[in-house]
Amino acid sequence: MVKEFFLNILSLIKNALVKFMKFFNTHFNRTTLKTKSILKKIEKNKENINVAMSNLSGSASIFYIWKAKDLKKYEDVLKHAGKSSFDLKYKEFEMDLNENNHYLEIPLTMSLDLKYVVEKSFEQFNASKNFAKSFKISSDTMKGASETSIKFATKEIEAEKIKENQRLVNDLNKLNILYRKVINNSLKSHNELLSKVEEYIK
């Protein structure tokens, strides 16, 4: 019984990580390769870019960079999952994510270094990736253990303990929605910036 219990936990964690790494390989690695390609193009076409930038006129375009590092203060929300303090911590995280402006605005001027803009955005992109990876692994481990505890519940396990595990699973599912929002905002912001930069290095 105990052996089967732990094998179930390991199986759930393994399956979750396989899916997560597939997501990473598909989206993050593709964006990373595109970033490196654009940085090479900037270096290769430096003179042409400088000429194009010096001829800029009219109102300046704005580059928007998603500031993932703003959210590092919420990394400990995971510790509150399943506890009475979770609702307040979750609400703070959700409100900050929805209501606050997490974008760094950089106007495009003739003195602007495109390489700096791409690297600055890539830095935030990687911060988001690390935040998500750490969160996802911890979350899936906790969730796998709780779901298995519920599945293997017997009369020896108190009903209150089952309820606690179910609450933890529910809290982690709610957090998963916010985690995905952080990821999607980061991917969208960085890819849009790369597309915008590409217009100046053709």
Residue ranges with predicted function:
Residues 36-202:
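Long, low-complexity or tandemly repetitive, helically biased scaffold regions used
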